Amino acid sequence: MKVAEEYDKGVPMMLAPQMGAIDATVESIRYRAQLIARNQKLDSGVAATGMIGFAAGFLFSLLMVIVLPLLFW
């Protein structure tokens, strides 16, 4: 009795799947997820420091508009 290797036959190979469209979709999803994560981090940072930045800007504007002209007049 001969085995399959002796006849140079084995289990037939399946066709390789077409992965181009799937890979492109995965990359698109990954890119969008990274954009969303970056945007959330930016929004969180702005929200966390918004009041401090507003206060610093307000004090700087008072210094430039009120205090400096009084010193130089």
Swiss-Prot record:
InterPro entries: MeTrfase_F, MeTrfase_F_su. It is an enzyme of class 7 (translocase). The keyword Membrane applies. The keyword Zinc does not apply. The chain crosses the membrane at residues 52-72. Keywords: Cell membrane, Membrane, Methanogenesis, Methyltransferase, One-carbon metabolism, Transferase, Translocase, Transmembrane, Transmembrane helix. It catalyses: 5-methyl-5,6,7,8-tetrahydromethanopterin + coenzyme M + 2 Na(+)(in) = 5,6,7,8-tetrahydromethanopterin + methyl-coenzyme M + 2 Na(+)(out). It is a single-pass membrane protein. Pathway: One-carbon metabolism; methanogenesis from CO(2); methyl-coenzyme M from 5,10-methylene-5,6,7,8-tetrahydromethanopterin: step 2/2. GO terms for molecular function: tetrahydromethanopterin S-methyltransferase activity. GO terms for cellular component: plasma membrane. GO terms for biological process: methanogenesis, from carbon dioxide; methylation; one-carbon metabolic process. It comes from the Archaea. Its main location: membrane. The complex is composed of 8 subunits; MtrA, MtrB, MtrC, MtrD, MtrE, MtrF, MtrG and MtrH. Part of a complex that catalyzes the formation of methyl-coenzyme M and tetrahydromethanopterin from coenzyme M and methyl-tetrahydromethanopterin. This is an energy-conserving, sodium-ion translocating step. Belongs to the MtrF family. This is Tetrahydromethanopterin S-methyltransferase subunit F. It comes from Methanosarcina barkeri (strain Fusaro / DSM 804). The lineage of its organism: Archaea, Methanobacteriati, Methanobacteriota, Stenosarchaea group, Methanomicrobia.
